[in-house]
């Protein structure tokens, strides 16, 4: 199978990561690498040698995005929605922005400040029922990077009724904020410092995390407190998730649930007891590392997960969903081992 692919927003970190992975995908060929502000400029990703001589084309739903089997939309919120509506049913989209993830219009408008454009099938294959929904899907909403790490850490316990009231602290590298120049991401500001941001439930990924947890509780609302931290590293997320155990739950039960849930998952590794996830171990891969522990003194479950925010957290997750939608083996073209040290 040969699949014609276009990448809208290929000049950014997420779009560039899609291109990197496509270069190693046996079924892919593409014509269009597009951008907004960098249209007409040479591809600015030095590590992508095979396309270094290419020039970014302007983004348009008519051309050059038209006529492709798959289009990856690696664009900021609201821009993807407008482009998808303009293209209509002719384009098969994998949206890597936030536009179509949330099911509640009011929640979307409160966190993003723009009109809600609906929701698409959610591209997290490991979540219950997702693979069936993604098979043959023409449009897929790729999860956010934080929700990917947190959902895969917590949904086995939440779905099994072992916990409630989630508390999440997650550390992310600077690439999660995009490639645009921002003063707080300058080397002098970031190096040697870890700082919180979007504290007090204001981060845009908070409702997505809650939505994913609620999806495995038969609609019973789940309370989530999420605090993100910016770390002086270019990529990676380490999420430390804590939740109150339901009475009578012990460490053995928790471990058994996670072992059963992830026994056959190609991209989720439940580590041996006593071994803890690290961002370096998953760097450049589509892999998720997970470890669980019970704090008996506090009656709390602690789950730690690590992902590469640009691979499994964005571009790799998008290709994984694309493989399922096209009927390809799910692991096609996706690295399963990290680069550490």
UniProtKB/Swiss-Prot annotation:
Task: List localization entries.
Answer: Cytoplasm
Keywords assigned by UniProt, alphabetized? Amino-acid biosynthesis, Arginine biosynthesis, Cytoplasm, NADP, Oxidoreductase
- Per the UniProt entry, the Enzyme Commission number(s) are 1.2.1.38
Copy the pathway line from the protein's UniProt record: Amino-acid biosynthesis; L-arginine biosynthesis; N(2)-acetyl-L-ornithine from L-glutamate: step 3/4
Q: Name one GO cellular component term.
A: cytoplasm
Catalysed reactions, as listed in the record: N-acetyl-L-glutamate 5-semialdehyde + phosphate + NADP(+) = N-acetyl-L-glutamyl 5-phosphate + NADPH + H(+)
Q: What is the protein named?
A: N-acetyl-gamma-glutamyl-phosphate reductase
